[in-house]
Regions:
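Sec-dependent signal peptide recognition
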Residues: 8-14
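Hydrophobic core segments within long, regular secondary-structure runs in both alpha-
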Residues: 43-46, 109-110, 173-177, 254, ...
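A short amphipathic alpha-helical interaction element
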Residues: 46-49, 74, 78, 112, ...
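Feature responds to low-complexity, polar/acidic, surface-exposed segments characteristic
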Residues: 2-4, 15-41, 56-72, 79-107, ...
């Protein structure tokens, strides 16, 4: 309705060139695990976590990235790096009905309960350590363990972010929201976030590694790349009049840009990228208003997008190309809305 394929290609190319400034060099590493060659998606995560003593492999020299992880194993992965081993060894009992003296995971579970990483009685009477750990559970526990405050951080953003993370009152919503902003996860090829998916060792390694890198200020490039990917999705969806997909993507793109800004608030390219993400969010809202025949709102939101794009190139002049394209799209939306307002219904 408002966006052409030619404009979409120009926007994405400009953004890709701009965020390339944040490319982080990759150094060659020797593989520690027989089943994780250097080109495996989990390679870098496993090597880093092994170097920090957080995750180890098996006696046969493998990592087994596809092996499922239960809740007890997940708690150990999360708790072991932050609670000293002596304290864990001193634990002799737990109020959980299914955690007994002699269980290898007793100390880790009790340390997690005492530190607010997991809920205990009376809210939860059983730990269910043998159950597979689900993605949202692992993400929540990891955030709690690191005092991330996901219920407060970015709480002003109350937007559906995927078809399976669309209800703002779902218990896992704030944790998945912060997971996107901290580069812990992103959508898959199916456009979903899969909060209820059982995790493997490889999954846990990736999520943990990404979060530790984010805390260390080393995921800015990844977050800006994710914001770029969401812009591609937005414009492709709008070409197909798929407004829901565009809305999900605009929310995720905004979260990714906000996450980068939380990490590197003084970087001009990050400041400009945030304004760009905000501009695309305004464009999507304008498109929705157009579908609802709220043409006054279209012109207002298109104007907002125009102004945000102007601010983006002021902050980061190398974003001029994408900012100009946003303004071209904004003008087209506003002009179309004005024409429709003057057309007899």
């Amino acid at each position: 309705m408002y966006v052409s394929l030619q404009k979409r290609q120009a926007v994405c190319t400009a953004f890709a060139l701009s965020i390339g400034l944040f490319t982080i060099p990759v150094h060659a590493q020797t593989a520690s695990f027989k089943d994780l060659p250097a080109d495996h998606p989990v390679f870098a995560a496993a090597e880093y976590l092994k170097s920090k003593g957080i995750i180890s492999g098996y006696s046969d020299g493998t990592f087994k990235p596809d092996k499922g992880v239960n809740r007890a194993e997940a708690i150990k992965i999360i708790v072991a790096p932050i609670i000293d081993a002596a304290s864990i060894a001193q634990v002799t009992s737990s109020p959980f009905t299914d955690v007994k003296q002699g269980d290898w995971f007793l100390g880790y579970v009790e340390a997690a309960r005492q530190n607010g990483i997991i809920d205990g009685p009376p809210k939860k009477t059983a730990f269910n350590g043998g159950n597979p750990v689900l993605k949202a559970e692992f993400i929540k526990m990891l955030q709690q363990a690191n005092n991330a405050k996901p219920l407060e951080t970015l709480s002003e953003i109350q937007l559906p972010i995927a078809p399976d993370v669309a209800k703002l009152d779902d218990w896992f919503y704030p944790y998945m929201r912060y997971a996107i902003a901290s580069s812990m996860t992103m959508i898959g090829a199916d456009g979903l976030l899969h909060p209820d998916r059982p995790l493997t060792r490889g999954d846990c390694a990736l999520i943990l590694h990404r979060y530790l890198m984010y805390k260390d200020g080393r995921r800015t490039q990844a977050l800006l790349s994710e914001a770029e990917s969401e812009i591609i999705i937005i414009l492709g969806a709008l070409e197909k009049n798929d407004i829901m997909t565009a809305e999900f993507a605009s929310a995720r793109g905004l979260l990714a840009a906000r996450g980068a800004h939380l990490s590197k608030p003084d970087e001009p390219i990050v400041q400009g990228a945030l304004k760009t993400a905000e501009a695309f969010r305004a464009l999507v809202r304008a498109y929705r208003a157009g579908l609802n025949k709220q043409y006054d709102e279209v012109t207002k939101l298109a104007g907002d997008a125009w102004n945000l794009a102007s601010r983006a190139k002021e902050l980061a002049p190398n974003l001029a190309a994408i900012s100009d394209q946003v303004q071209t799209i904004s003008k087209g939306m506003a002009d179309s809305a004005r024409t429709l307002m003057q057309t007899p219904q």
